[in-house]
Amino acid sequence: MRVMINGFGRIGRTVLRAWLKGGWPGLQITAINDIAPAETCAYLLEYDSVFGPLDGVSLESDTLVVQGHRLPLTHVADISSLDLTGVDLVLECTGKAGTIDVASRGLRAGALRVLISGPSEAAEATLVLGANDHLLRPGMQIISNASCTTNALAPLARLLDEAFGITTGWMTTIHCYTGSQPTVDAPRSTDPARNRAAALSMVPTTTSAGLLLDRVLPDLAGHIDCAAVRVPTASVSAVDLCVLPARPLTAEAVNAVLRAAGGVIGVTEKPLVSSDLRARPESIIMALPETRVTGGGLIRVFGWYDNEWGFSCRMLDMALRISEAPA
């Protein structure tokens, strides 16, 4: 499958870094589009403040050469002006594909399908690996890969619901700051708190994960609500999930279910901190020592997720799944 990356920001660059490490032999990244100059694209790929330097990066005019791969760069705001004939899938990583007009630009340029790295009202389906990816159908052209937090929460919620039933629940994501937040106090968001300096405070705010969870797992719609606290760290976030099960359980029984999960759900028995989970490929890594069950039967589980690296791996995984479904 021939893949183009549109938007070479945090997710676009991390997708490329993850792809270079291998594991997706059926995918061939062939081109990149970003409005930034070629020199900036190359520099930010080579030197990353979170993941460190990347060897083998050079620039030949508007061709990015990375570890032997030659990737032509274009710099247009609207990719419908490009000729994308021969591109099987556009990884839409601009963060701006919420409408059908923007989301379909790759299709109008000749690409066969589009996978969006975030929520979008234009998507024919919002799919999460390990939760509802079985709903992928031939002929789907615009697909949303949901969000990093939804990719962490949805497989976990499905697992727990199938194991013992979820009556109701609450999830708080403890989320590192992102590019949507200012580095100094500035009017950036309709949420007043998100306008405060990202690296100086914990910021209570909203998350799209609750809405997206209802789309991904409609049987749980209205059963789990969500909130977020943005914290002054640069990478790795956490899901703190409390649920009331349909029947009484022990912490040991819950952890047995988590240990047996596999797939995109990892586990750790160690007392780790967020920086220990950097560049982990799983959608979520459950911290088993943090599992609690109250006398009233409420279950609390806690899991880490690298909101950039893990989600980028899911973008590549979903691209591979899409390649198996005829256009």
Predicted regions, residues:
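NAD(P)-dependent Rossmann-like dehydrogenase/reductase catalytic/cofactor-binding core
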Residues: P281-A327
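A generic structural signal for alpha-helix starts
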Residues: A97, N151, P248-L249, G310
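N-terminal Rossmann-like NAD(P) cofactor-binding subdomain of oxidoreductases
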Residues: M1-N195, D317, A325-P326
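C-terminal substrate-binding/catalytic lobe of Rossmann-fold NAD(P)-dependent oxidoreductases
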Residues: R17, K21-L82, T167-T168, T173-I299
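Short glycine-rich or small-residue beta-strand-to-loop segments that form or flank ligand, phosphate
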Residues: R2-M4, I143-S144, V239-P245, I299-Y305
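Short, well-ordered loop/turn and helix-capping segments at boundaries between secondary-structure elements
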Residues: E162, D219, R247, A260, ...
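Structured loop/turn residues at secondary-structure junctions
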Residues: G95, C148, T205, A246, ...
